[in-house]
């Protein structure tokens, strides 16, 4: 069986509802537009569940922006997925989330519509990410700012805890980008 990636996810994995005909993940961006994740094929991705009122917000957002600015022209992309499952720390509407991320933290990377990352209603992408790289205490996402690093082929390379600073994984990003 071929290794599954975030770009081509079969219907039978995790008994998910049928995926689109091309078996690609699709999510809505913060403006409600459908985005096929296959558009990021060939890029190194850092996929992060974010929140605006978390204790990790003020450290993670600026570091994510720094990484994005530094490597966006070398094939690096950050995909931010707001989530309100941890302490209700992302209560805003999608519009409020966009204003917060893009104005306060100058986020130029894609911000998606709010998703669930755990439970029966978890976003299919997050079900796949968690099954690909379980955490220290099982597959569940434990808090905001859990990060998944995905290579250019869509394979999940690593998972980082919320306490892991984005800048501390720069070496892993550089390795996947083949940057000295």
From Swiss-Prot:
Catalytic machinery residues: 54
Keywords per UniProt: Cytoplasm, Oxidoreductase, Peroxidase
GO cellular component: cytoplasm
Predominant localisation class: cytoplasm
E.C. number: 1.11.1.12
GO biological process: response to oxidative stress
Alphabetical list of SUPFAM superfamilies matching this protein: Thioredoxin-like
Locations listed in the record: Cytoplasm
Catalytic activity, reaction form: a hydroperoxy polyunsaturated fatty acid + 2 glutathione = a hydroxy polyunsaturated fatty acid + glutathione disulfide + H2O
PROSITE patterns: GLUTATHIONE_PEROXID_1, GLUTATHIONE_PEROXID_2, GLUTATHIONE_PEROXID_3
Superkingdom of the source species: Eukaryota
Keyword Cytoplasm carried by entry: yes
Enzyme class, UniProt record, top EC level: oxidoreductase
Molecular function GO terms recorded: phospholipid-hydroperoxide glutathione peroxidase activity
Matches recorded under PANTHER family: GLUTATHIONE PEROXIDASE, PHOSPHOLIPID HYDROPEROXIDE GLUTATHIONE PEROXIDASE 6, MITOCHONDRIAL-RELATED
Family the UniProt entry places it in: Belongs to the glutathione peroxidase family.
Function: Protects cells and enzymes from oxidative damage, by catalyzing the reduction of hydrogen peroxide, lipid peroxides and organic hydroperoxide, by glutathione.
Listed name of the protein: Probable phospholipid hydroperoxide glutathione peroxidase
Phylogenetic classification of the source organism: Eukaryota, Viridiplantae, Streptophyta, Embryophyta, Tracheophyta
Encoding gene per record: GPXHA-2
